[in-house]
Amino acid sequence: MDVGSCNNHYFYDVDMKEDFYRCIAPSEDIWKKFELVPGFPLSPGGCPGGGGTDWGAELMDLGWESPMKLTGLSSVVLLRDCMWSGFSTRERLEKVIHERLTTASPRATNPQKPVADHENSEPGVNSIEQNANPLVVPTPVPEKVPNSSGSESTSDSEDDEIDVVTIEKRKSYGGRQPVTITVRADPTATKLFHISIHQQQHNYAARLPPEPNSMSPQPNFHSPIKEEPGEVTSPPALQQCSSPMPGSPLASGSSDSEDIVKKKNHNYLERKRRNDLRSRFLALREEVPSLTRSTKTPKVVVLSKATEFLKGLVIQEQQLTAEKFKLWSRHQQLLRRISHLKGR
């Protein structure tokens, strides 16, 4: 099985002018195509012992040219680490690598020439290869990171360390189901691959921003009529002083308020007048001797009795005035008689 051709259709684009990260998310059909069971790849850095360093150095000395000139990643193990496969044990991986070594022995006579040509044609390959070299150099992995979803392939030997490939399947409403892939490796390699794959999965489920027209407020054509700057509205108690323009809604409202104020004032004055009249009738009833003992007397009776009593008082006053005049004349007669008697 050609691993380079397997990775050719997923991670990289043959055209150098195209985007480095433009690719299509893998689906479940890729396992059926290569007759592989999905599992986690074997990390070249997690192989214990000194044998891993030997075959890793041989792979670096071979200098195989990757089918994708854009990447410059000439290590088959690195490509195998990027594109997970069904080789879950070290023995199977070494077997396939030895088969590749035997087939590539004619090309091993001049190992540095393809790399030199590639470096002359591509100035940015050296920096990418330096970032990818930590994946080829075997380094011990402290512990195995648990996977969030997917299936973990069982290894035949307990000493083998396994990198973690996280496969998170999202529910999509269309026919395609994008898969998010995270390659756990050296921090530089994680920065190289994980971020690029995350960028290609970014805009699949993005929503369109809301239209600016929907957020703009609608003009209100039914706004109430505003008052004129020169017009001053008075409080309800002083509505009589204001004189709004006739025929306007404000004038009708002010006239209604004026009617209400006038009605309130009229009711107050009427109640006050009735109270005063009642108190006067009560006082008049107390002055009439014939009505002092009656608690409930009609006003007409009180007025008639009071009138009669008043007329009687007037007659009595006249009689007293006439009697007084008589007494005064009698007094004058007596004074004149006294003086006449003294003159004798």
UniProtKB/Swiss-Prot annotation:
Organism of this sequence: Xenopus laevis (African clawed frog)
Keywords attached to this entry: DNA-binding, Nucleus, Phosphoprotein
Molecular function GO labels: DNA-binding transcription factor activity, RNA polymerase II-specific; protein dimerization activity; RNA polymerase II cis-regulatory region sequence-specific DNA binding
Subcellular location: Nucleus
The keyword DNA-binding is assigned to this record: yes
InterPro entries: bHLH_dom, HLH_DNA-bd_sf, Myc_transcription_factors, Tscrpt_reg_Myc, Tscrpt_reg_Myc_N
Annotated tissue distribution: High levels in oocytes, modest levels in kidney and low levels in spleen.
Residue ranges constituting the bHLH domain according to the UniProt record: 261-313
Ranges where the record places region Disordered: 100-162, 209-261
Domain of life (superkingdom): Eukaryota
The UniProt record lists the keyword DNA-binding: yes
Gene that produces this protein: mycl1-a
Region (Leucine-zipper) residue spans: 313-341
The protein, known as: Protein L-Myc-1-A
Primary residence: nucleus
SUPFAM superfamilies assigned to the protein according to its UniProt record, in alphabetical order: HLH, helix-loop-helix DNA-binding domain
Record Pfam families: HLH, Myc_N
Subunit organization: Efficient DNA binding requires dimerization with another bHLH protein. Binds DNA as a heterodimer with MAX.
Biased composition (Polar residues): 102-112, 123-133, 236-255
Cellular component per GO, a single term: nucleus
A GO biological process held by the record: regulation of transcription by RNA polymerase II
